[in-house]
Amino acid sequence: MTFRKSFDCYDFYDRAKVGEKCTLDDWDLMRIPMKAMELKQKYGLDFKGEFIPTDKDMMEKLFKAGFEMLLECGIYCTDTHRIVKYTEDEIWDAINNAQKEFVLGTGRDAVNVRKRSVGDKAKPIVQGGPTGSPISEDVFMPVHMSYALEKEVDTIVNGVMTTVRGKAPVPKSPYEVLAAKTETRLIKNACAMAGRPGMGVOGPETSLSAQGNISADCAGGMTCTDSHEVSQLCELKIDLDAISVIAHYNGNSDIIMDEQMPIFGGYAGGIEETTIVNIATHINSLVMSNASWHLDGPVHIRWGSTNTRETLTIAGWACATISEFTDILSGNQYYPCAGPCTEMCLLEASAQSITDTASGREILSGVASAKGVVTDKTTGMEARMMGEVARATAGVEISEVNVILDKLVALYEKNYASAPAGKTFQECYDVKTVTPTEEYMQVYDGARKKLEDLGLVF
């Protein structure tokens, strides 16, 4: 039987009030892991150690497993403790009508985001920025300007303001509203000072409540040509605050960036199981959010990094499969263990850039150095490396990419527990001129030389 109309966030809200009751523990500890394990066994999924898949039959099985995961599990609403289910036709309607391209930014600084494919020769869009990392108020503009000054960077992804007018942006307070507005206003001023006033941005990142996120759409702040973030919860969950934000974004004709970071070793389980959930999450971004694009970010439960062997495999298989069987536009966000001005940080970011570029990602978003949790530990140099490596990787044979990645990850994977802390932006850059130190340039050249030795041609 055909569906009555295309599914939207208002339908989600209505079903979240009447769906099947379920406890949070039952969802997290039983339904998600059991279904993911069942589907892995049903489809015989085995990635055999490949970062980027070469077996299209296995990719098709993975897509079917991810689709089935979303269809049979649905999405858990954490506010009502009920499950929202979609019909198969509603899911296919969303997939078949995915937004195939869009423009970020304005004027000569605008960039066209278009579908890429596995092994594509075109370089992906580089969304450079702190990626939700905490940034001090006094260096908020210089930090973001360091990205806008890099020609490899196409758009900016915002950092989090630790204070606004010296006060913490407490959720649901006037200071959160002020911070949500100020965040993007300062970043756009930074872009203008770099000679790129039309650069698109992705946020807001500081605000945690619906009113904070919605207030970011304002004069001098977020506009409909910027990426507007809404986050799913791990795994296959959402709250009603986010549904309200989605309603605002759709009603404002905003570009919607639906974000979620599946956790390897968490509720979903192992590599194949987490990838199944990741596929379901990608598809849900269309059904629930009507998203323009989905921002991925598989993260390791122990190391808090997106650059481990396991998380790169999840990202590579998920993106390649989504690219092969849908028109969903996908990005990935970067959280290396090491901090700025270290070779390890640059090599970690490079491994993910290689994976994302080769697997068909449309947008690379980063870099949140030092796992994105240390104040002021992020700079434009890491984004430069992300972009240069993407350019060097585009069009390289997948078999060669897998060999390079295996050797590259081996260079740093034994050092997660003792990853170098690195330096703050203030220690890496001249804050007044917004230029990197001689020390950082030497570190950068050293990392680049190691990548060349592995076979990358810059």
From Swiss-Prot:
The keyword Oxidoreductase does not apply. GO terms for biological process: methanogenesis; methylation. It catalyses: Co(I)-[methylamine-specific corrinoid protein] + methylamine + H(+) = methyl-Co(III)-[methylamine-specific corrinoid protein] + NH4(+). GO terms for molecular function: monomethylamine methyltransferase activity. Its EC number is 2.1.1.248. It holds the Pfam family MtmB. InterPro entries: MtmB_MeTrfase (IPR008031), MtmB_sf (IPR036655). Pathway: One-carbon metabolism; methanogenesis from methylamine. Keywords: Methanogenesis, Methyltransferase, Pyrrolysine, Transferase. It is an enzyme of class 2 (transferase). Disulfide bonds: none annotated. Belongs to the monomethylamine methyltransferase family. Catalyzes the transfer of the methyl group from monomethylamine to the corrinoid cofactor of MtmC. This is Monomethylamine methyltransferase MtmB3. The lineage of its organism: Archaea, Methanobacteriati, Methanobacteriota, Stenosarchaea group, Methanomicrobia. The gene is mtmB3.
